[in-house]
């Protein structure tokens, strides 16, 4: 990404401070890699009072010469601030600002975060920043205070008085963010999209690159917030804990049976896929495209084996599954899909399931995340999530066969219920095309194995055991 023309010059000490601070942030993708902060550019001023706050683009360069660009809104204070000590980036000399400045992550500073809402409501233009209101800016809670949601991996989200949620994209790519693109398209459908949150506004940036060509990127999106909703992962975990507490009962006999919700989630997923197909382009995969798709999966497997040697035991069966996809009959329907679908990406409100985060897998290039794909990718992702929900607690009980048996039963029951709901709402049954389903599930499990090896080694047996079952199922 080309740098913006600087509005505010960064103190010479600030890049080195950020180089120390960035690896500790959950959303920073370069953990464990050597890098330098190569460039900092300010896009525009968020606030000047009570404290100066700017939106910065920070470009890092790794030892292998790869680069990434991050959005880092910073607030500069003339003295330490106890309420934001936990997000202190560092202090620098500053003769123009009382002698020294203390720099903090501005998204955690409640004295300045309201500027995001005000900017969207007013449609402000500030420097290279553009604040774009949704269809009802008068509904925005301009006097609200913000609360940062914990647990996010790749973005930072702020809730404003349980009325709206602002998702700030930390990793910045030139071009339209797929989450905003999808929500805008769905909002234009007649009647809207019942299972997707309303888009209330967004923030974008426009600048000139070093060669003079124009560039744009999306920085944040504002949506309605569902105060009393619970995410699907938490609900599923409660059901699994109930099952483990009464392991002598079948999954269907336990009070916290999840199959009804899984069925309704399948219905909601089919409706969302239908809405996406109405609002955005569709197509089919011909023979060459299927071969290419299988080749991508094969390459991901080869790369993964280098990181997770345990995958070599399954590589032969996985290659068979991917070769079968390459030889699949042409004409596989494709469309825009969610791309990173799992139980943590859905909310259960008092009335319905709501689907969140249409960004796709953050680590993939933007062109791949915005491309057309089979809806089976989403179905496979959710099926894998049911496996995780059933088995993640087994990491603490590895030698209890009764619990393992019940976990298998819970996963199978809810996987089937989810797909039954999908078919009930008009979606095609992926079980009638096992080659497609096995390939997408295997591709997802390979991705999971790499993630667990790097982040949660005790969970690595979950995707490995799933791969063994997938290979056996594909061969049978």
Give the predicted meaning of each segment.
Residues 340:
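Conserved catalytic-loop position in the HRD/HxD motif
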Residues 2-39:
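Short Lys/Arg-enriched alpha/beta "domain-start" segment
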Residues 405-431, 435, 439-476:
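ATP/Mg2+ or Mg2+-diphosphate-binding catalytic cores
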Residues 285-323, 409, 413-425, 450:
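Active-site catalytic-loop/activation-segment of kinase and kinase-like phosphoryl-transfer enzymes
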Residues 53-302, 351-352, 356-408, 412, ...:
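Conserved ATP-binding subdomain of kinase catalytic cores across diverse folds
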């Amino acid at each position: 990404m080309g740098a913006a023309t600087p509005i505010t010059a960064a103190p010479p000490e600030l890049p080195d401070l950020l180089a120390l601070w960035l690896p500790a942030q959950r959303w920073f993708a370069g953990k464990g890699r050597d890098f330098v902060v190569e460039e900092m550019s300010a896009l525009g001023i968020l606030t000047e009072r009570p404290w100066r706050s700017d939106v910065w683009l920070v470009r890092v360069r790794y030892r292998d010469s790869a680069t990434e660009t991050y959005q880092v809104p910073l607030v500069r204070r003339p003295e330490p601030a106890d309420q934001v000590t936990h997000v202190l980036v560092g202090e620098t000399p500053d003769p123009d600002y009382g002698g020294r400045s203390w720099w903090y992550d501005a998204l955690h500073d409640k004295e300045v975060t309201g500027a995001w809402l005000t900017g969207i409501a007013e449609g402000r233009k500030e420097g290279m920043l553009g604040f774009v209101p949704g269809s009802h800016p008068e509904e925005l809670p301009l006097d609200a205070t913000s609360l940062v949601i914990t647990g996010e991996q790749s973005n930072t989200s702020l809730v404003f008085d349980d009325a709206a949620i602002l998702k700030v994209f930390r990793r910045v790519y030139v071009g339209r963010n797929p989450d905003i693109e999808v929500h805008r398209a769905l909002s234009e459908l007649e009647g809207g999209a019942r299972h997707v949150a309303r888009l209330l506004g967004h923030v974008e940036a426009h600048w000139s690159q070093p060669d003079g060509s124009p560039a744009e990127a999306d920085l944040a999106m504002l949506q309605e917030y569902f105060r009393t909703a619970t995410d699907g992962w938490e609900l599923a975990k409660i059901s699994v804990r109930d099952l483990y507490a009464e392991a002598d009962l079948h999954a269907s006999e336990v009070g916290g049976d999840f199959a009804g919700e899984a069925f309704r989630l399948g219905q909601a997923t089919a409706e969302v896929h239908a809405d996406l197909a109405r609002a955005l382009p569709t197509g089919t995969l011909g023979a060459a495209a299927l071969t290419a798709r299988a080749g991508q999966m094969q390459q991901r497997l080869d790369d993964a084996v280098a990181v997770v040697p345990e995958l070599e035991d399954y590589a032969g069966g996985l290659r068979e599954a991917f070769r079968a996809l390459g030889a699949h009959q042409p004409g596989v329907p494709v469309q825009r899909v969610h791309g990173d679908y799992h139980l943590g990406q859905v909310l259960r409100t008092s009335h319905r399931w709501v689907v969140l985060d249409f960004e796709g897998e953050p680590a993939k290039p933007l062109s791949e995340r915005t491309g057309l794909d089979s809806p089976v990718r989403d179905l496979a992702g959710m099926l894998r999530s049911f496996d995780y929900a059933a088995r993640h607690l087994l990491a603490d009980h590895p030698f209890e066969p009764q619990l393992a048996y019940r976990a298998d039963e819970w996963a199978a029951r809810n996987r089937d219920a989810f797909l039954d709901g999908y078919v009930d709402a008009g979606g095609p049954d992926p079980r009638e095309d096992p080659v497609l389903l096995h390939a997408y599930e295997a591709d997802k499990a390979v991705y999971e194995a790499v993630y667990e090896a790097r982040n949660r080694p005790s969970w690595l047996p979950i995707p490995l055991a799933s791969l063994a079952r997938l290979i056996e199922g594909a061969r049978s």
